[in-house]
């Protein structure tokens, strides 16, 4: 529920211009990369939302706009696998290999400083390339913004579970980003602790 709420909240602010909706999809993929440590899980969360957006905007499933939105979203998910250490399992495997072979660790912040600029550049390039390859049929989608607003309103206020997940996610992000600066806990350990907290009853 929280991932859908974040996606709709972002898309509700981008308006009805198709170019802004595409930018919104990239922003959603970027934000979720910070709190969902799996590209597969992020794609599984975002794709149904984007399918709903396409339907809400009244676009044909075989339209260029639909293809543009879906392909851009999935590629944005992959792009941010590079920029954020905890965004993909293969990053953690690579770091484990470096630790074992070279005795060198890479903190979350060090990874982000080194790799995030590449993901940002790729995201910008992705937008322009996709808009060039699959130009949408129209510049505006009448009623699209209202449809997103209605979907967001239908979700109602945040539930206790969503608030708890958001609090744990933001805390975990803060702990990840201060790894090696304020504490010595590695990303894997703090992730396991966060999962344990989410599994607690109540």
Task: Please report, for each region that a protein language model flagged, where it lies by residue.
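Membrane-embedded alpha-helical segments and adjacent helix-loop junctions characteristic
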Residues: 1-60
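Juxtamembrane and boundary regions of transmembrane helices in multi-pass small-molecule transporters
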Residues: 2-5, 39-42, 57-156, 182
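Generic, well-ordered alpha-helical scaffold segments in large soluble proteins
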Residues: 9, 13, 30, 52-56, ...
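Membrane-water interface of alpha-helical transmembrane segments
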Residues: 12, 16, 64-67, 155-162, ...
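Hydrophobic alpha-helical transmembrane segments
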Residues: 19-27, 70-71, 112-116, 166-170, ...
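Alpha-helical transmembrane segments of multipass membrane proteins
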Residues: 29-33, 80, 118-126, 130, ...
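Structural signature of hydrophobic alpha-helical transmembrane segments
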Residues: 42-46, 118-119, 186-195
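Flexible hinge motifs at transmembrane-helix junctions and intramembrane kinks/re-entrant loops
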Residues: 128-135, 158-163, 172-202
């Amino acid at each position: 529920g929280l991932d859908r709420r974040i996606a709709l909240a972002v898309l509700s602010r981008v308006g009805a211009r198709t170019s802004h909706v595409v930018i919104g999809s990239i922003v959603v993929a970027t934000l979720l990369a910070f709190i969902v440590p799996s590209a597969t899980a992020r794609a599984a969360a975002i794709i149904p939302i984007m399918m709903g957006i396409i339907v809400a905007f009244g676009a044909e499933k075989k339209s260029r706009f639909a293809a543009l939105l879906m392909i851009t979203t999935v590629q944005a998910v992959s792009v941010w696998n590079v920029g954020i250490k905890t965004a993909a399992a293969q990053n953690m495997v690579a770091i484990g290999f470096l630790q074992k072979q070279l005795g060198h660790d890479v903190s979350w912040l060090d990874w982000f400083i080194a790799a995030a600029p590449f993901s940002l550049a790729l995201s910008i390039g992705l937008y322009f390339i996709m808009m060039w390859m699959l130009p949408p049929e129209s510049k505006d989608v009448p009623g699209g913004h209202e449809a997103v607003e209605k979907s967001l309103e239908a979700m109602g206020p945040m539930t206790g579970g969503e608030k708890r997940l958001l609090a744990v996610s933001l805390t975990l992000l803060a702990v990840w980003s201060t790894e090696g600066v304020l504490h010595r806990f590695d990303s894997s350990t703090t992730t396991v602790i966060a999962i344990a907290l989410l599994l607690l009853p109540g």
